[in-house]
Amino acid sequence: METFLLTSESVNEGHPDKLCDQVSDAILDACLEQDPESKVACETCTKTNMVMVFGEITTKANVDYEKIVRDTCREIGFISADVGLDADNCKVLVNIEQQSPDIAQGVHGHLTKKPEEIGAGDQGHMFGYATDETPELMPLTHVLATKLGAKLTEVRKNKTCPWLRPDGKTQVTVEYKNDNGAMVPIRVHTVLISTQHDETVTNDQIAQDLKEHVIKPVIPAKYLDENTIFHLNPSGRFVIGGPHGDAGLTGRKIIIDTYGGWGAHGGGAFSGKDPTKVDRSGAYIVRQAAKSVVASGLARRCIVQVSYAIGVAEPLSVFVDTYKTGTIPDKDILVLIKENFDFRPGMMSINLDLLRGGNFRYQKTAAYGHFGRDDPDFTWETVKVLKPKA
């Protein structure tokens, strides 16, 4: 049997780049909760003892940016300089201006356009992907790497492994076979975890705890065998972490946010962007389209692309490829997609309820992936049943 290896990585919520994504989306949540018409493009960067938020926000909301930064850092677990950042005593810098009036008139006519007329906030192309290899219709490599990261955070916060600190990375290599275009996982080849830890714990304890409390509950036993390789904190020491160890920036983990290297990516990041930014809303609706194709039994694997011009409501192109796994021709699937999904930005905001912020709605997306999540706030994961015409 001919097989191949493919790898996906993830980082957990204490990674500096992910900290920035979560701050940017916490600010988006706060703006949309008070003013659903908020126009938000919020970036965050961080380094030792400092977090800065900057960008363009036009909103009627009254937002305490500094409080949101400190609260978000504290929730993640950055409560002292020892762990990489002290939420209550770090410097918080804010440099936020209004959205450019040139963009405002072109996209939403200074809020005068009807929803179906609202143009894309920028040019760009986005991809959605789905595969039948997991119940989530997501790639197994990505699902396992992401769940390992989430479990690391869980056992840190519930004190199962009190030696853990917030920063950490995971990576999973899976051996696959190609079944006429569909991906079939055979086994997990390699598991890599690098996690920040305190000064007291031994490397043996780290390896033992990670196997028992993180790997065993996450990776199904059927995928593990005597040849599976484990690299557990292979650098030997990871005490200094978070923004103290590395600078962080919003939008630097776009593959972790999506499909772990499978499918394709148009390059646009998600966090800190309101739904007129098609980098985000466009990527969400093509995930829904691709997932619906697979869930409806029209293909075992599917990728959908959409593209936009700034200020123009209708997409420039929509593309579908089922990797030769389709039960009907791709051209017929494309017709079904165009009939069932409205790719105009204003209509995506309505149909996917994207103008609703607050209650961590967007902040939740900013760690552990935007897709394959079982949560009613992830409206783009709702399947539309697609039926070919008789």
Curated annotation (Swiss-Prot):
This is S-adenosylmethionine synthase 2. Binds 2 divalent ions per subunit. The metal ions interact primarily with the substrate. Can utilize magnesium, manganese or cobalt (in vitro). Keywords: ATP-binding, Cobalt, Cytoplasm, Magnesium, Metal-binding, Nucleotide-binding, One-carbon metabolism, Potassium, Transferase. ATP binds at H15, D167, G168, K169, S235, G236, R237, F238, D246, R252, K253, A269, K273, K277. L-methionine binds at E56, Q99, D246, K277. One of its GO terms (cellular component) is cytosol. Pathway: Amino-acid biosynthesis; S-adenosyl-L-methionine biosynthesis; S-adenosyl-L-methionine from L-methionine: step 1/1. It is an enzyme of class 2 (transferase). PROSITE patterns: ADOMET_SYNTHASE_1, ADOMET_SYNTHASE_2. It comes from the Eukaryota. Belongs to the AdoMet synthase family. Its main location: cytoplasm. It comes from Solanum tuberosum (Potato). It is found in: Cytoplasm. It holds the Pfam family S-AdoMet_synt_C. The gene is METK2. SUPFAM superfamilies: S-adenosylmethionine synthetase (SSF55973). K(+) binds at E43. One of its GO terms (biological process) is one-carbon metabolic process. It catalyses: L-methionine + ATP + H2O = S-adenosyl-L-methionine + phosphate + diphosphate. Its EC number is 2.5.1.6. One of its GO terms (molecular function) is metal ion binding. Catalyzes the formation of S-adenosylmethionine from methionine and ATP. The reaction comprises two steps that are both catalyzed by the same enzyme: formation of S-adenosylmethionine (AdoMet) and triphosphate, and subsequent hydrolysis of the triphosphate. Its cofactor is Mn(2+); Mg(2+); Co(2+); K(+).
